[in-house]
Structure formats: structure tokens, C-alpha cells
Amino acid sequence: VNEWMQTGEAGIYAIGDIVAGYPQLAHSGSMSGIVAVTHIAGKPAKPVNKLRIPGCTYCEPQIGSVGLTEAKAKEAGHQVKVGKFPFTANSKASIIDNHEGFIKVVSDAKFGEILGVHIIGPVATELIAEAVAVMELEGTVEDLMFTVHAHPTVSEAMLDAFSAVEGKAINI
């Protein structure tokens, strides 16, 4: 398929698990369908960026990831900076007695571009959406470092993880 999910046959589109190269995840297929239908209707659409499709594992603790791992970023030639923040240092995670795991941010050392975010811990499958959104908007580590997060929330761990990239996490 092309970026609009069109096959080689005129007027035929394909989405979901049958499309090679796309993750076999409900949210991936759903967004591919939205892109296809929007394109069919002649409305403005934005293609799905396969690197920005979050992977989610619904277990305990939960796992959420998007983008490149540290190893893959280095293989791709990036100079990387990494920030890591443990949920044991997050107030809300302690309050709900669910503080196993951490958030790891992989960024480009020169420009602060967010290359990947990997989470294992409480509500990881929810938290990963913040990373996906900021990556889609081409936000930087600095952009997230200065985004106000409510307190006490598990999402504050995202703020601390991004701040940790620059050695400025306040809750460690």
C-alpha cells in the first residue's frame, strides 16, 4: 500500500492486519482506516508514521513503547542522550502502591529530538500517548521539560523522565 493505504489496484484500499509492515494492533488498523476513508472522501489527511505507532502490552506491569530503542538509535547513526526515571520516585505511583518499573527516553543529543520512549510500569499503555503526541508534533526534550503536569499524577513521571535526559529530574 502507499501512504494513503491504497493498493496497486485503482480504488482498492487495505488496512489492518493484512498490510505488511504495519504492527498487528487494533489502534494501528483503526488509524489506517481513518486515513484511508479520509483520503477516499477527498479530505485533508496525514499518513500514518509507522515509527509513531505505540506498542502496548496489557499485562502487569504494563508496557508501552514508541520509536527507537537506544540500540536502534545508535545503529541509525544518532548521537543519543538518555533519561531514565523510576516509578519508585513518583508520588502517585507510591500512593496507588504500584511503583514497579521506569520510563526511558531516547533523544538526539544535538537537537533534542525525541527518538523513542519506553515505559514499563503503572498505566504505561496510557502514558505512552503523551510521547506519541509530542513526537508527532516534532517536540523536543526541552518542550516536555517545561510542560506542566498535574500533581500528584503518574504522568509526572513523564516530566521527570524527560528532565532526566538533561540531568534535571527533580524527584530523584
Model-found features: residue ranges?
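Short acidic-hydrophobic sequence patches enriched in Asp/Glu that either
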Residues: S28-S32, N49, V123, E136
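Solvent-exposed alpha-helices and their adjacent loops that cap or buttress functional pockets
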Residues: Q6-T7, G11, N49-K50, I95-N98, ...
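Short beta-alpha connecting loops at secondary-structure transitions
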Residues: D17-A20, G55, D143
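FAD-site-proximal beta/loop scaffold in flavoenzymes
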Residues: V1-G42
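Flexible, acidic loop-helix segments that line cofactor/substrate-binding pockets
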Residues: K46-Q62
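Non-catalytic, surface-exposed connector residues within folded enzymatic/regulatory domains
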Residues: H27, P47-L51, G67
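Short beta-turn/strand-loop junction motif enriched in small, turn-promoting residues
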Residues: G21, G42-A45, K50, N90
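Flexible, glycine-rich terminal cap/loop adjacent to redox cofactors
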Residues: A41-G42, Y58-I172
